[in-house]
């Protein structure tokens, strides 16, 4: 799936409510990371994710994973550079958008 197909499908699935965050990063819940790093709620984070486009796409030249189905984006949110990794996968109720990472870029 190319980036344009991915973004179109991602937005549709998010609008349908077929979305979720991974539960934790480094032992911290994403709800807390979003508030601490950006001052936003999980609902606002999904709004930011829906506005991602090909101009925010970031290509990792040394990926730590081989799963090519995830796309990485970087964008400013409230003055802080965010690292956002999302993919579409099969969930219990069909396809869903999974936000693997949404945190301050290091």
List each language-model region with its residue ranges:
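Basic/aromatic recognition patch in beta-strand/loop cores that engages polyanionic ligands
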Residues: 63-89
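Enriched for short, Lys/Arg-rich terminal
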Residues: 81-106
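Compact soluble domain cores
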Residues: 1-67
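Intrinsically disordered, low-complexity sequence elements enriched in Ser/Thr/Gly/Pro
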Residues: 17-18, 73, 83, 102
